[in-house]
């Protein structure tokens, strides 16, 4: 982090390459500086910008479970908001997650025309942890806040200006513009504009209509965290700000411990750590394209799923029942394309376990053959290539969700019916560990 005082303006530049992530070290440094600034009488405004091409890209997903380590991002944001002088955030590049929450804590927000802002935590099963659910509705109302929070879609600078999320778009360099604006605020003795004290968005007569609409449209959404977001945005209009922050923190902790979020974060890491020979991106569409080795893995996984579905049908399960279970589990469609039927809880459990057992069993054999080094690589391929539901993190993790020891015992009973349920040696090995298949790493030939 870089810091200096110029003509009464404390100039803070976040410097944590390559994207100014809010690491624990940066939070400690920023926390200490904010404590000092609160006591200085020679500082009349504060400018916060980022080094390089982006303001701040938030927190590394792999460090989310350490986000509450002191000083927490929530504490940092509260200290920024409570400073006795105007604080201006100068935004550029793709501002993500904690970077957006940092900006919301400032009293003013400026952005370059090419800047985009996004809060994509919902896609990871997480609630935004540092005040976004309480500050954002105060600025833009419930409808816009929920759209930003639930969709995770980037908001352009122009859209942000129209909604009230930012105060202005600059045409020159953001650092110079932010400093100039700070000097303007000092000259005109402009008052503080703490978002916590704003009520414009909360006074929207359609605020609670937006809440009700969001509940209606997400009632069948598989991501459980979306209900927590809606509750938190509703709380913003019903509770004092500080109590609202406590409400948000409780839901943040709930989302952090949710197995669905754990699965989604694991998958996020797996997708970003796939070996280069397994996945590339199409130059034009930017879509992920599986390489030859990943395609070989995919063919084997698909084959095991097909055999399991066909075997269950041959043994008397209806096509509609099998498809209903697959769709309810999260697949876009069933194997047979049949009309889904009502399925008893007992039958639902068995169909699910037979499907996951077959696919994960083949995954174990893929590990044995050295075609993949890690179970997470197999899971990423399954999600990318065969539409395996993201919130289950792939078949190898899904086996752990069911219980590998339990699933292995079931497969030992089923393997007489078809080799697709043969228990692989790697499943015996995975059953020894709490982390299941994730505890196993093999050398690829």
Task: Locate predicted features.
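Gly/Ser-rich catalytic serine loop of serine hydrolases
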Residues: 93-99
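Amphipathic alpha-helical interaction surfaces in cytosolic regulatory modules
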Residues: 53-66
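N-terminal glycine-rich phosphate-binding loop for ADP-containing cofactors
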Residues: 1-4, 15, 27-29, 67-72, ...
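Conserved CoA-thioester-binding segment of acyl-CoA-metabolizing enzymes
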Residues: 1-51, 71, 75-78
